[in-house]
Amino acid sequence: AVEFTVTGTKASVQLAGDSGIKNSNNNTPRYAVYVDDALLVDSLMTTESETVTLFEGTAQKTAKVKVMLLSEAMYGGIGVKSVDVTSSASIPVQPVAKKELMIEFIGDSITCAYGVEGKSSSDPFMTATENFSKSYAYLTAQQLNADCSAVSYSGHGIISGYSSGDKNTD
C-alpha cells in the first residue's frame, strides 16, 4: 500500500495499471482507495489509467490517503502516477510516517484472502472475490499497529503448492 497525506481544497490521484489490465475481466487487478480510513473506491483496474477524486470543497483540509492492491500481484499491479492538488500549502503531499514495526507475509492466495467475498466455496477463482484488507495478514498487521507487505501467489505456498492439481512438496 501507498500512504500519504494531502492538503488542499481539491485533490485527485491518477492510478496506472500494468499489463494485468489485459487479463480477462474476472482477473484484472483489484484495488482500493481510502480517505481518512474510509473506503472511497473498491474497483477492478481495467484501463491503463484511472483518476479518483479524493475530495473537493471550498475550505482547505488535510486528509490521509491509502491506495492498496487487494488482489495477488501475479494478476497485475497498480501504481500512483500522479497526485493533483489545489492547495496553498507549501508541501501539499507528504508520505505518512513509517510505523515502528514492519511485517512481510509470504504465502499463497490464502494470504491475499482468496475467495473471501465469494458467494459460495465452489466459486471459481476471480480477483473480484479476493480482498487483502480482509486477509489474516492485513488484519494481524492492523492489530499489531504494523506496516505490512505481502507476497501472495496462487498455488505457491511456502510448504507446498497446488498449481497443477497435484500436491507439490519439493
Model-derived regions, located:
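Conserved SGNH/GDSL esterase-like catalytic core that processes O-acyl groups on lipids
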Residues: 73, 116, 121-170
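N-terminal secretory targeting modules
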Residues: 1-106, 110-129
